[in-house]
Amino acid sequence: SLANPGIRLYGAMDAKMYAEFTERLAEQTPGGPIVIALTTMEGDPEIARSMADDIRLLRDRGRREIIFLGKTAVYSAGVLFMAAFPVSHRYLTRATKLLVTENKRAQPMELAGGSLRSVASQLEHAQREIQREIDQEDEDYRAISEGSNVSIQELREKAPHDWSITASEAKAMGLIAEVV
């Protein structure tokens, strides 16, 4: 139940949280719904996507009802994880804030010296990598907005400015099923 989640996750969405998540998921008794409570203010988007994939696979292949309960803070990578759940299975506690952010490059780009053709090749590779990351971000925005009143375009426009959304605003936008 929402009052007693089977899995409680708190902290950075990192390899440690992922290990805890998979361990707790494996401990769940077969049958009924699984409620996952999450509080996170930071994290690795790739870890969040991996956790989201686990949820999708379990829901689609394992035929399990899985419910998301955001508590206090669901920032950035946490919102990516929340996107794995259909709107009808997303809940936030009253004081919870969502933070939708734009992906940032973790490392600066450096070009090795060499011939102009070599440098041009490096630039082309970097451009393809950046485009792949932009495409992934659009997929993330699509998952976040699916079933809601928020468009992908609105996410693209507001995410670069770190869009903070209260639980009641998220409900009004159709991003969640209910505020609890």
What do these predicted ranges mean?
Residues 1-180:
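Terminal-region recognition feature
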